[in-house]
Amino acid sequence: MGGKRRTAVDSVVGRNIRVLRLDRGLSQTELGRRIEVTFQQIQKYENGTNRVGSGRLFKIASILGV
């Protein structure tokens, strides 16, 4: 399996997660706790380093109210 490349979509999704998380007053640790991942994983999502799967994105959207 080849390496995954960061895409513009991954970056935009991550940026939107960060903006909404901060707007809701949540830390990376708290958001991670709520979706059962580490704060490091939230950092990777927000930086666009790791792609957010659809199921996890749905959980994040529900928590952030979008």
Question: Predicted regions span which residues?
Answer:
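Recognition helix of helix-turn-helix/homeodomain-like DNA-binding domains
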Residues: 35-52
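Short basic helix-loop element that most often maps to the first helix and adjoining turn
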Residues: 15-30, 34, 59
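A detector for short, charged/polar N-terminal pre-domain segments
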Residues: 1-12
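Short glycine/serine/threonine-biased micro-segments
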Residues: 12, 30, 46
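Short glycine/serine/threonine/alanine-rich loop segments
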Residues: 26, 37, 66
